From Swiss-Prot:
It comes from the Bacteria. Consists of three domains: the N-terminal catalytic domain, the editing domain and the C-terminal anticodon-binding domain. Signal peptide: none annotated. Belongs to the class-II aminoacyl-tRNA synthetase family. ProS type 1 subfamily. One of its GO terms (biological process) is prolyl-tRNA aminoacylation. This is Proline--tRNA ligase. Its EC number is 6.1.1.15. The gene is proS. Disulfide bonds: none annotated. Homodimer. GO terms for molecular function: aminoacyl-tRNA deacylase activity; ATP binding; proline-tRNA ligase activity. Keywords: Aminoacyl-tRNA synthetase, ATP-binding, Cytoplasm, Ligase, Nucleotide-binding, Protein biosynthesis.
Length: 581
C-alpha cells in the first residue's frame, strides 16, 4: 500500500471534548470522526484495526467450533416481550415503530433472536451442542456517551451463543469459549486478566470478564499475585479480617461527638483507629399486594467497618434482599431510629429492623457506632452484651488492597481494567422463557442449556490505546496495528536510488504477506515520522541517499529509544526476523 493511494488525515491537536487518551489519539490519528453523540465514522486507518481484530476473533471462534451467522440489527419487539426484557430494559433500549405501527428494537444484544433460531432449528439431541456467533453493530442509548468509542452508543461486538443438552455439556462449551478467549487476547498482544464476575442483568450462574489492564480503566480488578485468584470488585470475596472475636475490655459509653457525622471524623475526634468504627447503612424492601401497591415495608440496617465500603451486588445476594432493595427514605430512617442519618446505630431503636453485619463487623469487640442521637456516638460496644447478635452475617463489603486472598494463598492486590470481553453460563433462563426445547433420546422435550460470550470489537481499540501509548502517539501491538511496517523514504520524489530501494523493499515485504505502507507523499522527514509515530505503526524503515551511499538504511521499532543501522541488502530479512521474534 502506498500512502498516496490511502487516506491519511492526522491532527496536531485533539478536539477539546476528547477526555481520555484513546479518544484524543484516535481523533488525532484520523481513525475516527464524530458524527453525533456517541456515534462515530470509522475512517480507513481505524477500520483496518477493526478488521484485524475481527480476523483474529473469527479464526479462534472457528477453531473452537463456533459457526458464524448474522442476525439483524432491527428486531421485532415480540421476541423481547417473550422474555420480558422489552419492558424491563430502560431507555438504553431504543424502541422504534414501523409504518404499520409495529414495535421493533435496535438490538443491544441478540439472546432473543438466537434463541428463536435455536427453537426452530435445533430439534433433536443429535444436533447438539451448537454454538452460533456473529459480529454485528449494536446500539445502546447511553444517557451520557463519553470517552469516544469507550462508551459510545453505536458499537460493534462479537456475540456467541452456545446450546447444549445438559449442564455438563454446557460447562464444556463454556470452558471451550473461555480457552478461545484466552487465545484471542493473547494474540492481540495486550496485558489482560480473566476475572470471575457477577452475571448482572443478563442473568445466569457463571461469569468471567476479560479485562485489559489500564490505569484509566473504570473497573477495579482484584487478584492475588501469588495464586490464580482473580475477580472483579463486585464479586471478590472479602473474608473476615478478625479470625476470632475478642473479649470485651471496655464498658459501653455514650460519647459526645458534636458535628462529627462520619466515621473518619469520629475516629479523629476520639483519636482512635478508623477500623474501630462501624458505619450504618439503611435499606428498605417493599412487598406489593395484588394491586401493585406497597403492602409492607421492611427496614434493614447493614453494618460495615468504618474504613470499608458496602458492595451493592453482594448485598443483593443476601436472603431477603435478593428480590431488590432501595435506600430507605429519611422519614423511614427517623421513624425506626429516632434520628437523622449521620448518628445511626443498632442500639436504642424505635422500631425493629433487620440487622446484617459484615463478616468483619460480626467479629469486632469494643467498637464504635452511632447512638441514634444527634451529636452522640456509643463506644465500647460488644455483641451479646450490649446488643443481640445480628440477624445475619454476610460478605457485604468491597475488598481492599492487602486483604487476605480467599484461597488462602496470599494477600489481594487491586489494579484498574477495561472490560472488553464477557462470558456467561446462562442455564435455561432464555430457553424456558421462549420454550426452546429439543427432543432427547426418549423423545421427551428438554430445555436447552445456554451460554453467551461477548467481545467488544470496537472497544478493543480504545482499550489497547489506553494501555499502550506514549507522548508521541499510539503503540499498537503488531497483530492489530493498521500497518505492521512503514517505509519512510527521504527524497522519494527527488532521488531515483531512494525510490528504487523503497519500492523494492515495499514489494518484497508485501510479497511475503507483511502489511506494509510506503509513504510516498513527499512530506518532510519530521512531519512524516511524527505522523507514523502518532498512528502507531510498530516498525519503521528510513531510506535516504546518505544511507544508501554507505550501504545502510535505518530501522526503528516504535518502542525503541533510538534507530539502528542495517545493511541495505539485508533489511528485508532483518524486518522479517523482527516480526518473527
Amino acid at each position: 500500500m502506498k500512502a498516496s493511494q490511502f487516506f491519511i488525515a492526522t491532527l496536531k491537536e485533539a478536539p477539546a471534548d476528547a477526555e481520555v487518551k484513546s479518544h484524543q489519539l484516535m481523533m488525532r490519528a484520523g481513525m475516527i470522526k464524530r458524527l453525533g453523540a456517541g456515534i462515530y465514522n470509522y475512517m480507513p486507518m481505524g477500520l483496518r484495526v477493526i478488521r484485524k481484530v475481527e480476523a483474529i476473533i473469527r479464526e479462534e471462534m472457528n477453531r473452537a467450533g463456533a459457526v458464524e451467522l448474522l442476525m439483524p440489527v432491527v428486531q421485532p419487539a415480540e421476541l423481547w416481550q417473550e422474555t420480558g426484557r422489552f419492558d424491563k430494559m430502560g431507555p438504553e433500549l431504543l424502541r422504534v415503530k414501523d409504518r404499520h405501527d409495529r414495535d421493533f428494537i435496535i438490538q443491544p444484544t441478540s439472546e432473543e433472536v438466537v434463541t428463536d433460531i435455536a427453537r426452530q432449528e435445533l430439534r433433536s439431541y443429535k444436533q447438539l451442542p451448537k454454538n452460533f456467533y456473529h459480529i454485528q453493530t449494536k446500539f445502546r442509548d447511553e444517557r451520557r456517551p463519553r470517552f469516544g468509542i469507550m462508551r459510545g452508543r453505536e458499537f460493534t461486538m462479537k456475540d456467541a451463543y452456545s446450546f447444549d443438552r445438559d449442564a455438563a455439556s454446557a460447562a464444556r462449551s463454556y470452558d471451550a469459549m473461555f480457552a478461545a478467549y484466552k487465545r484471542i487476547f493473547d494474540r492481540f498482544g495486550l496485558q489482560y486478566r480473566a476475572v470471575a464476575a457477577d452475571t448482572g442483568a443478563i442473568g445466569g450462574d457463571l461469569s468471567h470478564e476479560f479485562q485489559v489492564i489500564a490505569d484509566t480503566g473504570e473497573d477495579a480488578i482484584v487478584y492475588c499475585p501469588t495464586s490464580d485468584y482473580a475477580a472483579n470488585i463486585e464479586l471478590a470475596e472479602a473474608v473476615s479480617l478478625i479470625a476470632e472475636r475478642g473479649a470485651a475490655t471496655e464498658s459501653m459509653a455514650k460519647t459526645p461527638t458534636p458535628g462529627k457525622s462520619t466515621c473518619a471524623d469520629v475516629a479523629q475526634l476520639l483519636n482512635l483507629p478508623l477500623a474501630r468504627t462501624v458505619k450504618s447503612l439503611v435499606l428498605a424492601t417493599d412487598e406489593l399486594n395484588e394491586a401493585g401497591d406497597v403492602a409492607k415495608t421492611t427496614v434493614w440496617l447493614l453494618l460495615v467497618r468504618g474504613d470499608h465500603d458496602m458492595n451493592e451486588v453482594k448485598v443483593g445476594k443476601v436472603d431477603g434482599l435478593k428480590a431488590g432493595f432501595r435506600f430507605a427514605t429519611v422519614a423511614e430512617i427517623e421513624s425506626h431510629f429516632g434520628c437523622k442519618p449521620g448518628y445511626l446505630g443498632p442500639i436504642g431503636l424505635k422500631k425493629p429492623v433487620k440487622v446484617i453485619a459484615d463478616r468483619t463487623v460480626a467479629q469486632m469487640a469494643d467498637f464504635i457506632c452511632g447512638a441514634n442521637e444527634i451529636d452522640f456516638h456509643l463506644t465500647g460496644i460488644n455483641w451479646g452484651r450490649d446488643l443481640p447478635e445480628p440477624d445475619a452475617v454476610a460478605d457485604i463489603r468491597n475488598v481492599v488492597e492487602g486483604d487476605p486472598s480467599p484461597d488462602g494463598q496470599g494477600v489481594l492486590a487491586i489494579q484498574r481494567g477495561i472490560e472488553v470481553g464477557h462470558v456467561f453460563f446462562l442455564g435455561t433462563k432464555y430457553s424456558k422463557a421462549m420454550n426452546a426445547t429439543y427432543l432427547d433420546e426418549n423423545g421427551k422435550p428438554q430445555f436447552m442449556e445456554m451460554g453467551c460470550y461477548g467481545i467488544g470489537v470496537t472497544r478493543i481499540l480504545g482499550a489497547a490505546i489506553e494501555q499502550k501509548h506514549d507522548a508521541r502517539g499510539i503503540l499498537w501491538p503488531d497483530a492489530i496495528a493498521p500497518f505492521t511496517v512503514v517505509v519512510c523514504p527521504i527524497g522519494y520524489d527527488r532521488s531515483a536510488e531512494v525510490k528504487a530501494a523503497a519500492d523494492a523493499l515495499h514489494d518484497e515485504l508485501q510479497a511475503a504477506g507483511i502489511d506494509v505502507m510506503l509513504d510516498d507523499r513527499g512530506e518532510r522527514p519530521g512531519a512524516m515520522f511524527a505522523d507514523w509515530e502518532l498512528i502507531g505503526v510498530p516498525h519503521r524503515v528510513v531510506i535516504s541517499d546518505r544511507g544508501l551511499k554507505a550501504g545502510q538504511v535505518e530501522y526503528q521499532g516504535r518502542c525503541d529509544e533510538a534507530a539502528s543501522t542495517v545493511p541495505a541488502a539485508e533489511v528485508a530479512a532483518f524486518v522479517k526476523g523482527r516480526l518473527r521474534s
